[in-house]
UniProtKB/Swiss-Prot annotation:
UniProt family annotation: Belongs to the ATPase B chain family.
Segments traversing the membrane: 26-42
Pfam families for the chain: ATP-synt_B (PF00430)
Localization per Swiss-Prot or TrEMBL: Plastid, Chloroplast thylakoid membrane
Species this protein is from: Phaeodactylum tricornutum (strain CCAP 1055/1)
Protein name: ATP synthase subunit b, chloroplastic
Length: 179
């Protein structure tokens, strides 16, 4: 900061800032000559640098365009593969649905068959039980009829001694015939 203060103080003491129009004093000719020599001597060097930079930029742009084209081709190929994959997925989904329907129908058929077999077994068991019950009832009826017949025969012939005598005589005769 002190340097700036000193500069402004010096400028204020010496009439301020002015434009020097003396070309020889200012060194403007020297600067222009130096710039001219640099341009003349360096144009080949600067031209080759600029040309090299231009080719590098053009090559970079072409590489970028090539990569863009390659990426576009890959994108198109990926989209084709995606479409094919979607078709395959749709086919698999349709086949799965058809297989599921077939399995359900076969399960229904199997269930019907199993139910029919169970029903036939139950019907056969029912008929067997029915026959068994019928035979048991028949035996009970025969047994009851025989008991009642014996009871009636005993009631009819018991008070009568003649029936007892007749029975005993018949038995004795039969024993005699058998011997």
């Amino acid at each position: 900061m002190e340097n700036f203060d000193q500069i402004f103080t010096l400028l204020a003491e010496h009439e301020g800032i002015g434009l020097n129009l003396n070309i020889l004093e200012t060194g403007l000719l020297n600067i222009l000559t130096l710039v001219g020599i640099l341009i003349y001597a360096g144009k080949d060097f600067l031209g080759s640098l600029l040309e090299e930079r231009k080719t590098t930029i053009v090559k970079g742009v072409q590489d970028a365009e090539d990569r863009l084209n390659e990426a576009q081709k890959r994108l198109n190929e990926a989209q084709k593969q995606l479409n094919q994959a979607n078709l395959v997925i749709s086919e698999i989904r349709n086949e799965t649905i058809a297989t599921k329907k077939v399995l359900l129908e076969s399960e229904v058929f199997g269930a019907k068959k199993d139910l029919k077999i169970r029903f036939e077994r139950a019907l056969a068991m029912f008929k067997s039980k029915e026959r068994q019950i019928f035979l048991e009832i028949k035996q009970q009826i025969i047994s009851l009829v025989l008991k009642r017949t014996v009871i009636r025969a005993q009631q009819a012939f018991a008070p009568k001694e003649r029936a007892t005598t007749l029975i005993n005589d018949t038995i004795n005769k039969l024993e005699g015939d058998l011997l």
